[in-house]
């Protein structure tokens, strides 16, 4: 069941992540300890994500920034779907090539950072491209660290495009049952 207070907090966090990343502090949330991860300036991606550990709580937020620069839009238009195994490679799961390019730019750093947390309720969120990356990250982290680190997941996305084929949807729904995709009209 949707927690609308949590959804509203996710909206605010998604809004905050669009600020200048170098000066971002989430000062409206003094009980949050942030870790920032961004892709290296390689000319192919501009992926930015904040991992926010809510102090005195078992809650952790992963907030992805959406399309902000022209390089983001170039990745958005790489529609072709490809198999990107997040597991053993024997899969029919396919993902949007551009979104995976953006995700893989920060994947290693993100998984390394997430390996430091145990027993957390992980709230993954993002707007637009950030919502697509949140969807991919939740599936990847759940598969690779979820049981090992005793992590539970909820996903709140806003205006997120679809990221994969039907096999991906089935895998995702089986692993992330608490996922809420908010769209407006024909989003």
Residue ranges and their predicted role:
Residues 1-125, 129-187:
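Non-catalytic, mobile gating and regulatory segments of ester bond hydrolases
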């Amino acid at each position: 069941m949707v927690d609308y207070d949590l959804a509203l907090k996710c909206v605010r966090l998604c809004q905050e992540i669009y600020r200048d990343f170098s000066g971002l502090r989430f000062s409206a949330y003094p009980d949050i300890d942030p870790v920032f991860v961004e892709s290296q300036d390689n000319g192919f991606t501009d992926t930015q994500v904040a991992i926010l550990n809510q102090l005195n709580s078992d809650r952790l937020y992963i907030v992805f920034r959406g399309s902000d620069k022209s390089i983001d839009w170039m990745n958005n238009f790489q529609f072709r779907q490809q198999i990107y195994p997040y597991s053993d490679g024997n899969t029919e799961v396919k993902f949007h090539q551009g979104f995976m390019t953006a995700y893989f730019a920060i994947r290693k750093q993100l998984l390394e950072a997430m390996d430091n947390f145990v027993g957390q309720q992980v709230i993954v969120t993002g707007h637009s491209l950030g919502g697509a990356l949140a969807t991919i990250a939740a599936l990847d982290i759940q598969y690779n660290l979820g049981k090992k680190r005793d992590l539970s997941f909820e996903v709140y996305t806003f205006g997120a495009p679809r990221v994969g084929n039907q096999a991906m949807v089935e895998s995702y729904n089986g692993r992330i049952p608490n996922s809420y995709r908010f769209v407006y009209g024909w989003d």
